[in-house]
Amino acid sequence: MHELALFTKIGMKTSELNLKAEILMAKYNVAPSFKGYRGFPGVVCTSVNEEVVNAIPGKRILKDGDIISIDCGVIHKGFHTDAAVTVMLGDIKPEVRTFVKTVQQSLEKGLAQIQPGVKTGDIGFAIGQWIESRGYSVVRDFIGHGVGRQLHEEPEVPNLGK
């Protein structure tokens, strides 16, 4: 993920990130988790600005002021991974920086809840409460999830809860 983030530049197509990810996967001798999963054609998801998640890499050209979420999964020794990184390109508006920071903080709030006996709803509550207390809303149609021998496993972790 770090190498993909560093590779991401203004003026490139999101398809170039996909190609770079394929090259890196070959270099590290891992297989893509996403390619072919439910018909997905890429090895990474490249969601730019208003695109929420799971966007297909293509001809979209990255511009000054864009934010891009790069979501990547690999299979290593029979186990899947799934992680994402957000890259801010060029001159980012203050309100966009604040938004990205708030989302990162919400992840940290959720992770801080994890301990034996805590329910996934408690984790989601911490995430959702932080987001909503900052004037944003949570996309309710998407959740976090476990990984293992399969790409999507239990537990499901919502971004809101009680």
Language-model features, listed with the residues they occupy:
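Active-site neighborhoods and metal-handling regions in enzymes and metal-associated proteins
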Residues: M1-K162
